[in-house]
Amino acid sequence: MTSRYEVVIGLEVHVQLTTQTKIFCNCSIAFGNQPNSQTCPVCLGLPGALPVLNRKVVEYAIKTGLATNCSIAPRSIFARKNYFYPDLPKGYQISQFELPICEHGRLDIDVDGTSKSIGITRIHMEEDAGKLLHDDGDTSRVDLNRACTPLMEIVSEPDMRSSDEAIAYLKKLHQIVVYLGVCDGNLEEGSFRCDANVSIRPWGQKEFGTRAELKNINSFRFIKQAIDYEIERQADILDDGGTVVQETRLFDTASGTTRSMRSKEEAHDYRYFPDPDLVPLIVSDDWVEQIRRELPELPEAKIARFVGELGIPQYDAEVLAADRAMAEYYDSLVKAHGNAKLCANWVMGELQRALNDSGAGIAECPVTPPMLAGILQRIDDNTISNKIAKTVFDAMWQSGKDADTIIEEQGLKQVTDTGAIEAVIDEVLAANPSQVEEYRGGKDKLMGFFVGQVMRATKGKANPKTLNELLKKKLTGE
C-alpha cells in the first residue's frame, strides 16, 4: 500500500528559450523546417569550429533566476558533458556543472489551500541535442536542426511529496517562463519538458529511497500519470520484499505505464570538465540590476494588486492573471472604464467566449479595451441594457465599429420612457388575463413570463429596472 510510504519527488525542467538564434552560433531555431537546413560547422560539431555565447541566452537565464528567487552567480563556467548518442555530433554536450549561473531559489505553490515552498537547486544553461527520426523499418535518421538550441535546465530540490504538488510546481514555473517571454511554453513542440525523479521511503526514514528518473514527459496530464504509476510500482516492489533499481524509465502514454530504458547515470559517468573553448562568464551587479528593473509584474504580484487595489475576488484575479496578455488587456480596460468588477465580468465572460469561439488569442482581439469600455459606459448611463450590450459586442467584434455607431445604426437604444413601457405592459396584461389571475393567486414565478412578453414586444429595449418596477405595481395594484 502506498500509504505506508512517503513519496519524494524532484523535477528537472528543460526550457527551450525564445531567442532567434542558437546558443553558440547564428543558426535559426525556427521549428518545423526541413531536416538539417538550420546547421553550421558549430552545431554540426566539425573540427576547428568555435562556439560564441549568445548574450540573450544569459539575459533570459538571469531573468528566470530573479523571478524564481535565485542568487545570480558573478562567475559561472561552461562544462563539457561527455556521452555518446547518435544525435550528439560533438560527442559531448556543452552545459554547466559546478558553477551554474543561478542557485538557491524557491517557488511557492498552493495545493488544496495549503501553501508550500519548493526549493530550486540550480538553473543552468546548455545546448540541446539533435533529434532522431525513426523509419518504419530498422533505420533511423538524424535531424540536427535542434542541435545547439538554447535550453535552461531548472532543477528542483526533492521537496515534493505527491504528484499534485509536482503539477502545481510545474504549472507555476510554466506560467513564469511564459510571462517573462523567455519560453513560448509549447509542450507539444517540446519547449517545456520535464524529467521526474521519483522515490519512496517508509514514513520516518531520513534516507532517501532509490530513485527512478522518468524522462522527457511533455504533458501535465502524462506527468501526473507517470508519477502516480511509478509510486505504485515502487510500492509493490518493496511490499513484495524486492529492491528498487536506480534507472531511467520511459512513460508509455498508450498503456499508462513506465518501462525501463537504461541504468541511471551518475555525474561522474559524464566526466564533466570546463570547456576550454569558452571563457568563464562574468556577470556584473549592474547587469543583474538592469535586468531586474526590466522584469514584468509577475502573476503573484498581479493577483495581489487585483485583489488589494481593485477589490475583485481572489478567483477573478487568478483567472485574469493566468495569462499576461489577458491581464494587460484587463488593466487597460479598468483604466478606460473604472469599474473593476464589471470589467472582470466582461473579460472573463463575453470576451473569453468570443476568443474561444474564434480560436483567436488576445493579441488578435478586434475589440480593444477602449472599444469595450465604450459598451460598458453605455450600460452605466442606461443607454443599453446588459442583454443589448452583448448584441453590441458581437456587432463590434464583426465590424470594428464603436459602440455609439452600432447602437445608432441598429436602433438599440434602451426605452426608458415610463409612459411607453407602461402602455406595452397594459397590452401584455390585457392579452393574458388568466396568467394575471394566477399571479395574483400566488404564482410569483409568472413574473418572468410577463417580463419576457414585454421584452419581446419592445425587442429587448425596455429598461429592465423600470420594467420590473412598473410591472410589479400593475400586478399588485399598488
From Swiss-Prot:
This is Aspartyl/glutamyl-tRNA(Asn/Gln) amidotransferase subunit B. It comes from the Bacteria. Heterotrimer of A, B and C subunits. Coiled coil: none annotated. Allows the formation of correctly charged Asn-tRNA(Asn) or Gln-tRNA(Gln) through the transamidation of misacylated Asp-tRNA(Asn) or Glu-tRNA(Gln) in organisms which lack either or both of asparaginyl-tRNA or glutaminyl-tRNA synthetases. The reaction takes place in the presence of glutamine and ATP through an activated phospho-Asp-tRNA(Asn) or phospho-Glu-tRNA(Gln). The keyword Nucleotide-binding applies. Belongs to the GatB/GatE family. GatB subfamily. PROSITE patterns: GATB. Keywords: ATP-binding, Ligase, Nucleotide-binding, Protein biosynthesis. The lineage of its organism: Bacteria, Pseudomonadati, Thermodesulfobacteriota, Desulfuromonadia, Desulfuromonadales. GO terms for biological process: glutaminyl-tRNAGln biosynthesis via transamidation; translation. SUPFAM superfamilies: GatB/YqeY motif, Glutamine synthetase/guanido kinase. It catalyses: L-glutamyl-tRNA(Gln) + L-glutamine + ATP + H2O = L-glutaminyl-tRNA(Gln) + L-glutamate + ADP + phosphate + H(+); L-aspartyl-tRNA(Asn) + L-glutamine + ATP + H2O = L-asparaginyl-tRNA(Asn) + L-glutamate + ADP + phosphate + 2 H(+).
